[in-house]
């Protein structure tokens, strides 16, 4: 009997140890190894993230800890940095960007997350991010909006962010604009010069309503990317799996100005596709 119990315990322990590998092979945080991009000196990227630290239901102020999903910030950060870019970090209010603690646990943590946790310069940027009001978006070649549940509370509600996205779109340097998962909510209120939706009629993606339901936050978070993008007139595209948490898709709009990723699995490819577009304009 003791041997049987011991065998079961060992099997459970081995399963727990293997879980990160299992979910990775199932589709979580897939590798993306496109052709290496190295940009000329002087190129700048701006990553925008949330200040929201509490997953609170409507009318409430308390709830579980939340924030940016680590990989949705770290994957693009290191892709841009390693391509030779200066990478700035901003948020709606400035100051600390909360990192959702669940997203740096053993099951979800990625090599880029480990690199971040040992990177004093990056950690300092997260603790003291720039306020978007104080950032000139037109001085950047890439503007990337990270997601995470926290972004559902502030990115889509910021008139300053919407205005600055519009300004960047019309800037002479034509920056590439994008984001992943809930980060795309930062695009929904951007306007063109006629006061109409800047993103209407464009092909885009973001986290699906299906995934939000599967994660159990459909009745908690105030905005849902698929719903809001469709309201803004976007031609919404997505992939689906038995669980959308394991799906991924990256969409480049026909004008090649916007690059959007479906969810946390899309950060590496989204960042790489943005780099490719910047590189194509630099030659």
Predicted regions: what is each one?
Residues 2-174, 185-283:
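Extended, subdomain-level signal for the structured scaffold at the beginning of enzyme domains
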Residues 177:
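Conserved, well-structured core segments that form or line functional sites
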Residues 181-183:
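Catalytic nucleophile serine of serine hydrolases
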């Amino acid at each position: 009997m003791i041997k049987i119990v011991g065998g079961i315990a060992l099997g459970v322990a081995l399963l727990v140890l293997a879980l990160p590998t299992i979910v990775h092979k199932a589709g979580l945080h897939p590798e993306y190894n496109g052709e290496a991009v190295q940009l000329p000196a002087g190129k700048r990227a701006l990553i925008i993230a949330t200040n929201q630290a509490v997953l609170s239901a409507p009318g409430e102020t308390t709830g579980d800890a939340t924030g940016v999903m680590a990989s949705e910030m770290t994957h693009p950060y290191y892709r841009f940095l390693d391509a030779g870019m200066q990478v700035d970090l901003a948020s709606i209010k400035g100051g600390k960007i909360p990192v959702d603690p669940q997203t740096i646990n053993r099951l979800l943590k990625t090599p880029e997350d480990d690199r971040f946790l040992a990177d004093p310069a990056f950690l300092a940027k997260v603790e003291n991010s720039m306020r978007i009001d104080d950032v000139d978006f037109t001085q950047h070649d890439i503007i990337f909006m990270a997601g995470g549940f926290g972004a559902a509370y502030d990115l889509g509600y910021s008139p300053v962010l919407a205005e600055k996205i519009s300004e960047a779109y019309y800037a002479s340097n034509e920056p590439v604009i994008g984001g992943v998962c809930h980060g795309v909510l930062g695009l929904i209120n951007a306007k063109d010069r006629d006061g109409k939706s800047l993103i209407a009629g464009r092909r885009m993606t973001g986290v699906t309503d299906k995934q939000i339901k599967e994660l159990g936050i459909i009745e908690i978070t105030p905005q849902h990317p698929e719903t809001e993008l469709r309201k803004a007139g976007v031609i919404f595209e997505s992939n689906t799996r038995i669980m959308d948490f394991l799906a991924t898709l990256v969409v480049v709009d026909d004008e090649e100005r916007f690059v959007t990723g479906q969810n946390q699995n899309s950060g590496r490819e989204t960042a790489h596709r943005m780099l490719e577009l910047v590189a194509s304009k630099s030659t």
